[in-house]
C-alpha cells in the first residue's frame, strides 16, 4: 500500500509529529494551509492519506485520536464539501487505535495521562479518492508540544503500516458504527477488545441523509453496520434500519 504522510505548517502538533516521523527516515508531504481546509488537488495521488494533526477541545483533556474526515451535514464550516465523506480503511483506523493504546499503556508513557479513542466523522477534506485518516494529539497547546505524545503516534504509525504492508493482522469482520458520542466510546471499546475492524463512525446527534448512508456503504469495505442501540434516538433507529433493510444491508445491534 502506497501512503502519504501529510503535515500542515500551521499546526504545532503536526509539526511535532512530523519531526519524529522524519527522524525514522520517512518522508512527509508538507502544506501551507490547515489540513482540514485542504482538498484532493493539494496532494499527489496515493493509496492512503495520513494527516498528522492536532486535536482541540474545550475540555483540554489529553487525548490521542484517529478518525476519517467527512461532513455528515450541510455544515462545511470546518473544511470540505457539504454532505461528503472521504473513503475509509477500517483496518488502518483500528490497528492505529490499538497501537496507540499499546504504547500509551507502557510504563514510560503512563504518566502523560492520555486517553486513546476514535472520533466520529467531522471536518474536511472530503473529496479524497483513497482512504484517509487523521492521527491526532489533543487537546490543547500544552499537549501538542509533547515529544513523547508524538513518539507514541509515530511508533503506532510504523507498527500499523508494517502490519498492513506485510498482511500481519488477524482476519476479523469489518464494520461501520452508528450512534453514541463524539468519541464513540462503544466502538472504541469494541476495537480495543479486538472484536472488529471499525471504520466510519457517526454520532447520536447526526441526522444521516440517504446521501450520506449511501456514501458510507460504498466508500468503505464492510461486513455489517453496527448500531449502538442505546446511543441513538428512536426515530433515527427506525429510519436507518428501514434504509438498511430496503437495501439488503446487514446490520446488528452492538
From Swiss-Prot:
Transmembrane segments: none annotated. Its EC number is 3.1.1.96. Its cofactor is Zn(2+). It comes from the Archaea. Residues 61-85 are annotated as: Disordered. GO terms for molecular function: D-aminoacyl-tRNA deacylase activity; zinc ion binding. Residues 65-84 have a biased composition (Polar residues). One of its GO terms (biological process) is D-amino acid catabolic process. It is an enzyme of class 3 (hydrolase). PANTHER family: D-AMINOACYL-TRNA DEACYLASE. Monomer. This is D-aminoacyl-tRNA deacylase. The gene is dtdA.
Amino acid at each position: 500500500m502506497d501512503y502519504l504522510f501529510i503535515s500542515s505548517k500551521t499546526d504545532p502538533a503536526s509539526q511535532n509529529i512530523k519531526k519524529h516521523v522524519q527522524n525514522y527516515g520517512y518522508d512527509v508531504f508538507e502544506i501551507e494551509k490547515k489540513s482540514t481546509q485542504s482538498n484532493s488537488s493539494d496532494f499527489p495521488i496515493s493509496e492512503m492519506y495520513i494527516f498528522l494533526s492536532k486535536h482541540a477541545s474545550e475540555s483540554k483533556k489529553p487525548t490521542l485520536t484517529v478518525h476519517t474526515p467527512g461532513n455528515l451535514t450541510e455544515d462545511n464550516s470546518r473544511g470540505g464539501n457539504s454532505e461528503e465523506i472521504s473513503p475509509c480503511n477500517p483496518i488502518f483506523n483500528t490497528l492505529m487505535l490499538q497501537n496507540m493504546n499499546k504504547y500509551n499503556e507502557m510504563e514510560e508513557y503512563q504518566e502523560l495521562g492520555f486517553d486513546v479513542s476514535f472520533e466520529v466523522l467531522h471536518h474536511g477534506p472530503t473529496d479524497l479518492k483513497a482512504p484517509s485518516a487523521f492521527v491526532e494529539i489533543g487537546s490543547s497547546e500544552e499537549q501538542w508540544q509533547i515529544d513523547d505524545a508524538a513518539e507514541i503516534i509515530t511508533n503506532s504509525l510504523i507498527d500499523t503500516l508494517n502490519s498492513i504492508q506485510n498482511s500481519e493482522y488477524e482476519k476479523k469482520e469489518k464494520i461501520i458504527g452508528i450512534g453514541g458520542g463524539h468519541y464513540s466510546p462503544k466502538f472504541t471499546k469494541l476495537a480495543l477488545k479486538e472484536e472488529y475492524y471499525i471504520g466510519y463512525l457517526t454520532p447520536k446527534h447526526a441526522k444521516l441523509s440517504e446521501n450520506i448512508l449511501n456514501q458510507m456503504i460504498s466508500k468503505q469495505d464492510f461486513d455489517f453496520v453496527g448500531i449502538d442501540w442505546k446511543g441513538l434516538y428512536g426515530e433515527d433507529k427506525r429510519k436507518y434500519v428501514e434504509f438498511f433493510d430496503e437495501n439488503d444491508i446487514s446490520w446488528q445491534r452492538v
